[in-house]
């Protein structure tokens, strides 16, 4: 589910910092953060002139295969964010910066950042 790059998956599965059990407090904190960020009043606190670039893998189960990202993108637009962009990378999974097409992702992010520098 992480990436199609089997070298990255093998590295991840063998790394001591990536193969730990999530604690009850970890889950509690995760759900508190998810609850906080999904509240409409918190969307409305985001500065409307803050540019945002949402990128995700279209095959990421964590993002509901792109549907979750589309939903959040629309919520941001509906809250009045003026400059928001979204790109879903077909066939990419959760870690798009570690995918087989990572150079394309890097290039797209660099182009977006360059276009938004003042």
Regions found by a protein language model. Give the residues of each.
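Short, histidine-centered active-site or binding-site loop motifs used for metal coordination
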Residues: 16, 56-58, 90-93
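Short strand->helix junction
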Residues: 19, 61-62, 95-96
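Conserved strand-to-helix beginnings and helix N-cap segments that scaffold or border functional pockets
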Residues: 24, 65-69, 98-103
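Alpha-helical elements of Rossmann-like donor-binding domains used by nucleotide-donor carbohydrate transfer enzymes
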Residues: 29-32, 71, 104, 108
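Catalytic active-site module of serine/aspartate enzymes centered on a nucleophile-bearing elbow/loop
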Residues: 37, 79-118
């Amino acid at each position: 589910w992480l990436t199609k790059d089997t070298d990255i998956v093998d590295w991840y599965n063998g790394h001591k910092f990536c193969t730990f059990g999530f604690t009850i407090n970890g889950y509690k904190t995760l759900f508190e953060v998810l609850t906080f960020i999904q509240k409409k009043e918190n969307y409305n606190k985001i500065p409307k002139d803050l540019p945002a670039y949402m990128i995700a893998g279209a095959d990421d189960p964590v993002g509901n295969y792109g549907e979750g990202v589309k939903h959040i993108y629309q919520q941001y637009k509906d809250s009045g964010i003026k400059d928001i962009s979204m790109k879903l990378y077909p066939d990419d999974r959760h870690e798009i910066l570690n995918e087989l097409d990572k150079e394309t992702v890097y290039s797209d992010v660099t182009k977006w950042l360059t276009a938004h520098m003042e």
